[in-house]
């Protein structure tokens, strides 16, 4: 928001000698940051004076252009004979060439004389052009860097604000330059500062001076006027239609209006547009003007019909959404409420009668509409932040009065439909601001601050009953008022106090567990990666997973970074596959990489409710939202390819295989003290004969093994690439909370080896578990050290060889005790697994 200081001073009684820097500092400390201070006309130097055109002779040129040879009175000082004039001896004035069509006899103009320097370092000097010595320049607004003037050069009335112009006097004070303009960064929560009225109120409060409110009126209720209006939507609380007729649209806009809106960052167009923009900048209330002759029947405020179209002022045919709020007449939609008007009722050069619209629209409705149509405007920026509802009527009346004053219009009676909505009420403890801000502000000062902010305050004991002013929709709950008090006393007055130490709680059990797991995987030789959490249909097709797999339950992004990957990942493997292929393209062929991260699986079809923003959602609504969220388990995955150990002088290379994939899961389980069971399984994308299910506490938490050749080919991975993926949250949750530390026995160990023959379908883990049960408490450890399949054990049979370590806690085991324990273990394996002792 750009704030010209002269406009600000029209509303605020700033003390004499108040500098712009002081105003900027006060505004920054209490309300919004002043990003910079611009100086309009600050580059102008030299003689720039008021001139009076005594004569103007049009002279057509060969190129078809018409120039004016003007004799300009610039006062006794600059008309003197000592200055070059290029006109007859004894004749007053200077000769100046000008091509502007409004350089006519009798006009009062701004003249840059030789020696003046304009913006960009453009120096003025006498020079011969079009057959004459041009002794200066008649200036346009853009040439002075103070605005835009499509009519040509600047022309002034003979009297400006009661001052009779005199040829030769300094023109810059007449033009109001140089003028300082504040560039204020208005954040979304202080939408009322999108107006001069709002900024002026904040400056007055910050500097403890008087504020003159040009829109200080009481709310107006329904009024039956000549324009028929029907409001059919709750998204419009009040609508004002004010007819203005007999208007001369060709009348020039007063210079004070064009100067102010130009310095505020807007371009002058014509009287109606300039006046509505001026009032919007002044009050914060957007207005819209309809050509009354093109409005048929009743003006209706309603939601758009399905498939309805509107040709907007930017000449774009828009298909409306049923949630769009529109202004319509008997012919259909004539405007997108709060955003942009329609071309059918646009004010043109032939317009003589208009209907001024002032309305209060729902901020969310306007915000959604302009985002839906990608049609931001000055009006929508203000409506979405909240507009003072009282100004809907007062701003329309103000604009109509200006049109009557400067355009000769006649103002009719307004039609007012709806009421100004009531503002929220709140009760707070008088000491709440001090408790939250850490200040010691007396209650009397709190009341004074809120009252100056426009809040109606009623003190009852230790409580303050508060009613927000109409221009402050941001004051809703108690803490909004606390923030208001903090801003108004100045955050620079609040001393920095370190919060008391609550004692370090440390990491949670889950955090400690995850760190141990990640550290163990890194120590095993793997490199951690972080990949983007997005996948596409092609990624899922590469994995070869079935349609009912939970990894197909994707969450689609509304605005994906990459249209080919519009889903949140349901597995970590695609990201690792992309990372591996990228590294291979850079000649990195031996890779062992892993990633831990969240995946997202929409396993519940429920849709999350959309609560309003005006109140806290209930516990039931929050529970429904949580229930509709996708499952988000934290997973760990790794991919291994190439050589596990490269060729070296003391041995051959070791190729990576499925055992290294299983190693990742085993290392993770060992780091947590969790018993991991591995069992043959079939699961995409792994090879059906080289895939192990990873089981903890009887539940499958993941899989490991060699990838299916088809998957390897589609993903562009090296042959025999292996992978593992498991639920890290489930593994960490299974970690024991504590354990018993067994005493270290000083007695020798007894070692027994057994080789058992079982069917190929029997899992080695089942045999191992049977041996543990049969051996009893003397078994210290057991290890599978050999697997054999061949003629010696028969078809569909395999031999599993285990090493049993036996030790007594209080004695040395005898040979017979060791043999008995071994036999008991074998007997249990025979009983449960059908195992036979291999001879």
From Swiss-Prot:
Reaction(s) catalysed by this chain, per the record, are:
tRNA(Phe) + L-phenylalanine + ATP = L-phenylalanyl-tRNA(Phe) + AMP + diphosphate + H(+)
The protein in question is named: Phenylalanine--tRNA ligase beta subunit
CDD domains from the entry? PheRS_beta_core (cd00769), tRNA_bind_bactPheRS (cd02796)
Complex and partners = Tetramer of two alpha and two beta subunits.
Q: What are its cofactors?
A: Mg(2+)
Localization of this protein: Cytoplasm
Q: Where is the FDX-ACB domain?
A: 745-838
Which top class of enzyme applies to this chain?
Answer: ligase
- Originating organism: Cutibacterium acnes (strain DSM 16379 / KPA171202)
- One cellular component (GO) term of this entry: phenylalanine-tRNA ligase complex
Q: Which residue range or ranges hold the tRNA-binding domain?
A: 42-166
Gene of origin?
A: pheT
Q: Where does Mg(2+) bind?
A: 474, 480, 483-484
**InterPro entries to which the protein is assigned, alphabetical:** aa-tRNA-synth_II/BPL/LPL, B3/B4_tRNA-bd, DNA-bd_dom_put_sf, Fdx_antiC-bd, Fdx_antiC-bd_sf, NA-bd_OB-fold, Phe-tRNA-ligase_IIc_bsu, Phe-tRNA-ligase_IIc_bsu_bact
Its family? Belongs to the phenylalanyl-tRNA synthetase beta subunit family. Type 1 subfamily.
Q: How is the cofactor bound?
A: Binds 2 magnesium ions per tetramer.
**B5 domain: from which residue to which, for each copy?**
421-496
Just give the chief location class: cytoplasm
The cross-references to Gene3D superfamilies, in alphabetical order and at most eight, read: 3.30.56.10, Bira Bifunctional Protein, Domain 2 (3.30.930.10), Ferrodoxin-fold anticodon-binding domain (3.30.70.380), Nucleic acid-binding proteins (2.40.50.140), Phenylalanyl-trna Synthetase, Chain B, domain 3 (3.50.40.10)
Domain of life of the organism in this record? Answer: Bacteria
SUPFAM superfamilies under this entry? Anticodon-binding domain of PheRS, Class II aaRS and biotin synthetases, Nucleic acid-binding proteins, PheT/TilS domain, Putative DNA-binding domain
């Amino acid at each position: 928001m750009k704030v010209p200081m002269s406009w600000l001073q029209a509303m605020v009684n700033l003390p004499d000698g108040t500098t712009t820097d002081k105003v900027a500092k006060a505004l920054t400390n209490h309300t919004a940051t002043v990003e910079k201070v611009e100086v309009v006309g600050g580059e102008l130097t030299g003689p720039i004076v008021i001139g009076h055109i005594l004569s103007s002779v049009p002279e057509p040129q060969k190129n078809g252009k018409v120039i004016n040879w003007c004799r300009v009175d610039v006062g006794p000082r600059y008309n003197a004979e000592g200055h070059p004039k290029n006109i007859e001896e004894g004749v007053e004035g200077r000769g100046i060439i000008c091509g502007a069509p409004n350089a006519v006899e009798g006009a009062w103009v701004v003249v840059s004389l030789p020696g003046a320097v304009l913006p960009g370092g453009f120096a003025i000097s006498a020079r011969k052009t079009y057959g004459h010595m041009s002794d200066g320049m008649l200036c346009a607004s853009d040439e002075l860097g103070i605005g835009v003037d499509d009519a040509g050069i600047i022309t002034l009335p003979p009297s400006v604000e009661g001052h009779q112009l005199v040829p030769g006097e300094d023109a810059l004070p007449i033009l109001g330059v140089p003028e300082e303009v504040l560039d204020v960064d208005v954040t979304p929560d202080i939408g009322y500062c999108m107006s001069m009225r709002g900024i002026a109120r904040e400056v007055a409060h910050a500097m403890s001076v008087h504020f003159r409110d040009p829109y200080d009126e009481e709310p107006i209720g329904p009024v039956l006027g000549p324009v028929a209006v029907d409001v059919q939507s709750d998204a419009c609380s009040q609508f004002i239609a004010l007819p203005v007729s007999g208007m001369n649209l060709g009348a020039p806009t007063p210079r004070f209006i064009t100067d102010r809106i130009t310095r505020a960052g807007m371009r002058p167009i014509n009287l109606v547009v300039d006046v509505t923009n001026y009032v919007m900048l002044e009050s914060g209330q957007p207005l819209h003007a309809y050509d009354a002759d093109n409005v048929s029947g009743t003006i209706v405020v309603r939601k758009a019909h399905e498939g309805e179209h509107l040709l907007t002022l930017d000449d774009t045919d828009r298909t409306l959404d049923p949630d769009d709020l529109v202004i319509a007449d008997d012919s259909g939609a004539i405007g997108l409420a709060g955003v942009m008007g329609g071309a059918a009722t646009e004010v043109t050069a032939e317009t003589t009668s208009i209907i001024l619209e002032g309305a209060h629209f729902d901020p969310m409705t306007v915000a959604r509409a302009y985002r839906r149509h990608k049609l931001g405007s000055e009006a929508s920026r203000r409506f979405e932040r909240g507009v003072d509802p009282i100004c809907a009527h007062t701003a329309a009346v103000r604009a109509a009065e200006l049109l009557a004053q400067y355009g000769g219009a006649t103002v009719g009676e307004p039609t007012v439909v709806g009421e100004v909505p009531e503002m929220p009420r709140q009760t707070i403890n008088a000491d709440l601001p001090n408790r939250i801000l850490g200040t010691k502000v007396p209650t009397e000062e709190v009341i004074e601050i809120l009252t100056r902010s426009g809040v109606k305050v009623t003190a009852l004991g230790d409580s303050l009953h508060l009613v927000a002013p109409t221009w402050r929709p941001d004051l809703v709950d108690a803490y909004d008022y606390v923030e208001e008090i903090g801003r108004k006393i100045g955050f620079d007055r609040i001393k920095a106090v370190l919060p008391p130490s609550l004692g370090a709680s440390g990491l949670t059990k889950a955090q400690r567990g995850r760190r141990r797991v990640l550290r163990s995987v890194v120590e095993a030789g793997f490199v951690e990666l972080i990949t983007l959490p997005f996948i596409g249909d092609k990624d899922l097709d590469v994995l070869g997973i079935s349609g009912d797999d939970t990894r197909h339950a994707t969450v689609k992004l509304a605005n994906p970074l990459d249209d080919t990957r519009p889903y949140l990942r349901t597995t970590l493997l695609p990201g690792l596959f992309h990372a591996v292929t990228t590294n291979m393209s850079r000649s990195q062929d031996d890779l062992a990489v892993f990633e831990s991260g969240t995946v997202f699986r929409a396993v519940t079809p429920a849709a999350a409710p959309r609560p309003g923003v005006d109140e806290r959602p209930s516990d039931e609504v929050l529970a429904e939202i949580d229930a509709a969220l996708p499952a988000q388990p934290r997973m760990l995955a790794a991919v291994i390819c190439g050589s596990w150990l490269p060729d070296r002088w003391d041995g051959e290379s070791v190729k990576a295989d499925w055992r290294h994939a299983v190693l990742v899961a085993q290392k993770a389980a060992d780091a947590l003290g969790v018993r991991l069971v591995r069992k043959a399984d079939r699961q995409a994308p792994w090879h059906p004969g080289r895939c192990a299910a990873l089981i903890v506490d009887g539940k499958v938490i993941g899989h490991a093994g060699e990838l299916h050749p088809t998957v390897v080919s589609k993903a562009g991975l090296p042959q025999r690439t292996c992978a593992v993926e498991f639920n890290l949250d489930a593994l960490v949750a299974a970690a024991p909370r504590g354990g018993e530390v067994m005493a270290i026995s000083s007695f020798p160990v007894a070692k027994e080896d057994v080789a058992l023959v079982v069917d190929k379908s029997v899992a080695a883990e089942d045999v191992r578990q049977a041996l543990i049960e049969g051996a009893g408490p003397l078994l210290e450890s057991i290890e599978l050290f050999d697997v054999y399949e061949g003629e010696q054990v028969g078809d569909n049979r395999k031999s599993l060889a285990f090493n049993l370590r036996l030790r007594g806690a209080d004695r040395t085991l005898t040979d017979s005790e060791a043999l008995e324990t071994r036999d008991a273990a074998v007997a249990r394996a025979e009983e449960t697994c059908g195992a036979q002792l291999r001879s």
